[in-house]
A protein has these predicted regions:
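Alpha-helical transmembrane segments of multipass membrane proteins
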Residues: 49-50, 67-74, 90-97, 113-121, ...
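Membrane-interfacial alpha-helical segments at the cytosolic side of multi-pass membrane proteins
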Residues: 37-56, 87-95, 135-146, 258-262, ...
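Hydrophobic alpha-helical transmembrane segments
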Residues: 42, 60-67, 82, 86, ...
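Membrane-helix interface "capping/anchor" motifs
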Residues: 51-61, 95-107, 144-145, 320-326
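Aromatic-rich juxtamembrane segments at the membrane interface
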Residues: 1-86, 93, 200-203, 358, ...
């Protein structure tokens, strides 16, 4: 709880554990852990309110509020959201001081333009986009819509016994206030309570309810406007955010002021109040984060989808005050764009009629995307960091942070299969994240005595509804128009040599994926490889010295070899001798450590391969 208070007051999030971060991310409430305009505005409002309470001039109050905002920004090293809020507040207060009409959207656009003049590259920065679009959503859609929906109801409920207020209200509001008083007054006599107590008991909850509706409307507006940039940058939609903000909004009003005051005064009771409220916030966020179906992940939208979504939000902002049917039409258009972004009803970035193999750049690990000829996709291994000599898994989830985003950018929503060649962490650590997000129809594993490392993977597969297929040496089956053959040396002594080897046949070309086999495994492969001519070889064991022997290369005659290895890794992969062997046989080499993601594809007759540095074609 203390770490949450530090994050919410000073932007210091290093004390937060990974579980807490994950809960706030899943609930859509992570923004409260990053000091933003909400915190700056609250702090400035407290300063202005304090000056006014002392009876000092309004000009001094405004100047103090702006000074507090800029001082807070300097304290936090002028982080973008804080600086944005400080300058927006200064512009807004300046307009008030010179008696100019204050337009929040004008202030937002003016400050954004000034920031871009200072640093044009910020236009592509996710933080810049989310920061300004969020406040634009509040000012342009959320606040006006909440005002239009809830203001008449709040006018009815506010100070219900004060008949003098009726003179300044619309007729329809007055009629409802009179009817409510006519109902409450006899009720107070029946129950024997004063009218104010009856109002507090019956009208008070209604006021709270309409305040909650306002928070929901504003949160929904932010969710709507941020859908496109969130899906594009993070491939995630925070559907739970409007509900999480019901707890965030009131608790932030307690935590931030109490935390600031505790920092300034050192008062222990204030710090205890802030940590108690932070504990309640953490409980609420944890509960919301467990709601099934509200943590939605989607491939990034295309340029036209983003443009249409943002344009529909602009139309909605303009239509709110135009009339009911215009507002409904604009809202329907914005909702339709949101649904398109969420469902992403587009084919993945895979060419039908081609077999593709892409080595994803996962550092010193391996994750291979296999694009099948029918337009579906599979994955062989899921990356991870080597953990040799350690029982502790890496805190950085390669599957969640690298593999899944790459597959998402390719427009893939579900995998036909996930194959794990063996249980080393650099091949399977990311598999659980891939299973959770892409729910493969099948999980392929070598039919050998399973090690304990496979058990969490099997449990995750069962939870995802994934069929588990154990493959033995010689198993052959079709994956659409592609034939798949498995080779496994079940009697080999080395752990790596028992890797699942897969051969994908399409037309005239064969792709050989060798896992981490070394000398013993290669000998078994050479003895059991029917039709040994190979077009594409995924070099065994990241190109280690004891792999990719001259015998294997002489037998297979590959055209292209892909090496999956980390840049300047500790193991010296790929070994210089392996690169020399490949060069002597005129094999084109693609390396993830130098070229990034490397792709080879075939239409059954012609090979194409590409990486960051070059694109080649071969008809052999």
């Amino acid at each position: 709880n203390a770490a949450i208070v530090r994050a919410m007051t000073l932007g210091e999030s290093r004390g937060l554990d990974e579980e807490t971060r994950s809960r706030f991310e899943l609930s859509g409430a992570y923004h409260v852990l990053v000091v933003s305009g909400m915190h700056v505005g609250l702090l400035a409002a407290l300063a202005i309110g304090l000056i006014r309470a002392l009876g000092l001039p309004m000009g001094l109050a405004w100047s103090t509020g702006a000074a507090v905002a800029f001082g807070y920004a300097l304290l936090l090293d002028s982080q973008l959201p804080v600086s944005r809020a400080a300058w927006m507040l200064a512009a807004y207060l300046t307009a008030s001081a010179v008696y100019r009409r204050r337009q929040a959207l004008n202030v937002i656009c003016g400050v954004a333009l000034a920031f871009l003049c200072w640093e044009p590259a910020w236009i592509a920065d996710a933080g810049f986009q989310l920061s300004f679009l969020a406040v634009a959503a509040i000012a342009g859609i959320g606040a006006p819509l909440a005002e239009r929906v809830t203001r008449p109801r709040r006018q009815v409920l506010r100070d219900i016994w004060n008949a003098d207020r009726d003179m300044r209200l619309p007729v329809e509001v007055v009629v409802r206030r009179v009817a409510l008083r006519d109902w409450l007054e006899p009720l107070s006599r029946i129950v024997g309570l004063r009218k104010r107590w009856v109002e507090l008991a019956l009208v008070g909850p209604a006021r709270i309810g309409w305040a909650a509706v306002s928070v929901l409307i504003v949160s929904a507006a932010i969710t709507l406007v941020l859908a496109a940039p969130l899906a594009y940058h993070f491939q995630r939609l925070a559907l739970a955010a409007p509900f999480a903000n019901l707890a965030v909004a009131p608790l932030l009003i307690v935590i931030a002021p109490a935390g600031f005051a505790a920092l300034l005064t050192g008062a222990l009771p204030l710090f205890q109040l802030a940590t108690a409220a932070a504990g309640l916030l953490s409980t609420c966020v944890s509960w919301v984060s467990q709601w099934d179906g509200l943590q939605y992940q989607t491939p990034p939208p295309g340029a036209w989808s983003i443009a249409a979504a943002l344009a529909s939000c602009v139309l909605l902002a303009r239509a709110i005050d135009k009339g009911r049917w215009q507002a409904w039409m604009a809202a329907a258009a914005a909702a339709a764009c949101w649904v398109v972004i969420a469902l992403h009803p587009f084919a993945p970035d895979l060419k039908k009629g081609r077999l593709e193999l892409t080595a994803i750049d996962v550092g010193q690990g391996e994750a291979l995307l296999v694009g099948l000829a029918d337009g579906e996709a599979g994955l062989v291994d899921a990356g991870g960091f080597p953990n040799f000599g350690s029982d502790e898994p890496s805190a950085f989830d390669i599957g969640e942070r690298i593999v899944a985003p790459y597959l998402g950018r390719r427009g893939i929503k579900r995998l036909a299969f996930l194959a794990i060649t063996h249980a080393d962490a650099d091949h399977m650590a990311g598999a659980e994240a891939v299973l959770r997000r892409f729910a493969p129809r099948e999980l392929w594993l070598p039919r050998i005595l399973l090690s304990a490392e496979f058990r969490p993977l099997l449990e995750a597969a069962r939870e995802s509804g994934t069929r588990i297929r154990f493959l033995a040496s010689g198993d052959s089956f079709a994956a659409g128009a592609v034939d798949v053959t498995a080779i496994v040396c079940e009697l080999c002594t080395g752990r790596n040599d028992r890797s699942l080897v897969l051969v994908f046949d399409y037309g005239e070309h064969r792709f050989l994926l060798t896992g981490d086999i070394e000398h013993e495994g290669e000998q078994y492969l050479i003895a059991h490889l029917n039709n040994p001519h190979i077009a594409v070889l995924k070099t065994p064991h990241h190109g280690s010295r004891n792999s990719t022997s001259d015998v294997l290369l002489k037998l297979t005659h590959p055209t292209v070899a892909i090496v999956s290895a980390g840049f300047e890794n500790l193991y010296g992969h790929p070994h210089a001798e392996v690169i020399q062997r490949l060069a002597r046989r005129h094999v084109s080499v693609l390396r993830t450590d130098l070229d990034g993601a490397a792709t080879v594809s075939s239409d059954g007759r012609r090979l194409e391969w590409k990486a960051q540095r070059h694109v080649q074609e071969d008809s052999r």
